[in-house]
C-alpha cells in the first residue's frame, strides 16, 4: 500500500512538473492543502483565488487542491521546492526541517494568551524576517493562518498530566512536540494527520492533540469522545510559496499576490471563530464528545513542560531572538491588562 502511495505521488509530481504550463494562455497556479473544503483555510484560499483572478485573470488561473490530494504536507512542501506546486499550506512543524527558527512554535506555553499570539503574528514587518529564513530551501512563507489552540483529546478524560501517563498520543513530526508529550510521561507517536482517525479507532494510539475542527472536519470525534482544554500550544499554519515563482512576478503582479495573501488571512481569521463554535456544537450534540474545560489543571501541565524552554534555547540558538521578542509582547500585553 505504501508503495502504491509513493507511486501515486511520483506520478502526481511528474504530472505537475509542467506546472508553468499555460491553459488558454494563462499560467496555472496550484495550491495544495490538507484540510476539507469547509475549513477556514480553504475559504481563505478561495478569497485568494478570487482576488488574483479578478485583478490578473487574463494571466493566471488559480487551482486549489484540498484534502492532501497532492500528498501530505511534507510531500507537498518538497513539490513546492521543485516548483511542481506553487503554494502549499503547511504547519510550522513541517518547516522545522528547512529552518530551525520554526521550532519555536512547537515550544509549549510560549504565548501567554491568544491576544499575544495574534499580536506577534500580525506584526508583518517582524514576521517577514522569519518568513525569509527558508529562502535557501527554495520557498518562502507569504502569510499565516490561525490554526487555533492545540489541546489533547482521546478515548478517556484528560484533566491532569497524570491522565496521560502511559498513553500513546499522536503529535506533529516535531522534536519539541515529542519532548513535550514525553514530559507528561506519555509515548509520542508522530504520524501523518490523515492516519490519526484509523490509529485511534484501531487502538494504535490513545489520543491526539489538535484544535476542535479535527473532531468534525476529520471525524476524530467519532473515535475520541473527550476533548480537554489544557491549551499547550498556539501554532499557526503557513502559506508557503515557491521562491522562483515569486521572483518571476513583475512588481505589479507580486503586489496583487501579496494583497491576495493578506486577504486570505483576514477571511480565514473571520471564519475561524464561527467554525470553532459550530464544530463544538456538532461534536457535542451529534458525536457525543465531552468538552472538559474548568476541570483541567492547566498550570500542572504548564509546570511539567516549562523546563523545555531552557532546553530548546540551549539546543537551538536560532530561536533566541524570536523567543525574546515574544516574551516582550507577553509582558507588554500583561502590563496593559
Predicted regions and their residues:
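N-terminal secretory/targeting leader peptides
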Residues: 20-115, 125, 134-135, 140-337
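Generic cytosolic/nucleocytoplasmic N-terminal low-complexity/intrinsically disordered segments
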Residues: 1-2, 303
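Short, Φ-rich (hydrophobic/aromatic) sequence segments
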Residues: 8-11, 120-123, 326
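Sec-dependent N-terminal signal peptides of Gram-positive bacterial secreted proteins and lipoproteins
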Residues: 2-21
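Signature of the catalytic double-stranded beta-helix
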Residues: 120-132
Amino acid at each position: 500500500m505504501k508503495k502504491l502511495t509513493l507511486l501515486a505521488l511520483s506520478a502526481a509530481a511528474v504530472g505537475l512538473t509542467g506546472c508553468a504550463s499555460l491553459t488558454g494562455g494563462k499560467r496555472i497556479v496550484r495550491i495544495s492543502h490538507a484540510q476539507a473544503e469547509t475549513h477556514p483555510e480553504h475559504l481563505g484560499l478561495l478569497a485568494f483565488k478570487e482576488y488574483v483572478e479578478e485583478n490578473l485573470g487574463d494571466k493566471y488561473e488559480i487551482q486549489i487542491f484540498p484534502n492532501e490530494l497532492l500528498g501530505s504536507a511534507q510531500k507537498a512542501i518538497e513539490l513546492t521546492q521543485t516548483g511542481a506546486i506553487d503554494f502549499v499550506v503547511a504547519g510550522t512543524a513541517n518547516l522545522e526541517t528547512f529552518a530551525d527558527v520554526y521550532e519555536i512554535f512547537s515550544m509549549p506555553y510560549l504565548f501567554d494568551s491568544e491576544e499575544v499570539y495574534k499580536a506577534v503574528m500580525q506584526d508583518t514587518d517582524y514576521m517577514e524576517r522569519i518568513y525569509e529564513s527558508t529562502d535557501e530551501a527554495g520557498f518562502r512563507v507569504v502569510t499565516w493562518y490561525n490554526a487555533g489552540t492545540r489541546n489533547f483529546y482521546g478515548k478517556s478524560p484528560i484533566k491532569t498530566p497524570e491522565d496521560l501517563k502511559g498513553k500513546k498520543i499522536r503529535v506533529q513530526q516535531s522534536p519539541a512536540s515529542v519532548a513535550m508529550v514525553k514530559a507528561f510521561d506519555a509515548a509520542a507517536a508522530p504520524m501523518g494527520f490523515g492516519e490519526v482517525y484509523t490509529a485511534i479507532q484501531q487502538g494504535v494510539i490513545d489520543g491526539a492533540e489538535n484544535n476542535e475542527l479535527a473532531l468534525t472536519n476529520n471525524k476524530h470525534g467519532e473515535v475520541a469522545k473527550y476533548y480537554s482544554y489544557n491549551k499547550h500550544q498556539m501554532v499557526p499554519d503557513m502559506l508557503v510559496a515557491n521562491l522562483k515563482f515569486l521572483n518571476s512576478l513583475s512588481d505589479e503582479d507580486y503586489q496583487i499576490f501579496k494583497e491576495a495573501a493578506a486577504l486570505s488571512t483576514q477571511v480565514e481569521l473571520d471564519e475561524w471563530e464561527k467554525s470553532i463554535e459550530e464544530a463544538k456544537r456538532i461534536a457535542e450534540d451529534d458525536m457525543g464528545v465531552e468538552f472538559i474545560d474548568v476541570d483541567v489543571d492547566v498550570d500542572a501541565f504548564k509546570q511539567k513542560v516549562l523546563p523545555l524552554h531552557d532546553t530548546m534555547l540551549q539546543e537551538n540558538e536560532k530561536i533566541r531572538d524570536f523567543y525574546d521578542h515574544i516574551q516582550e509582547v507577553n509582558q507588554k500585553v500583561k502590563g496593559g491588562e
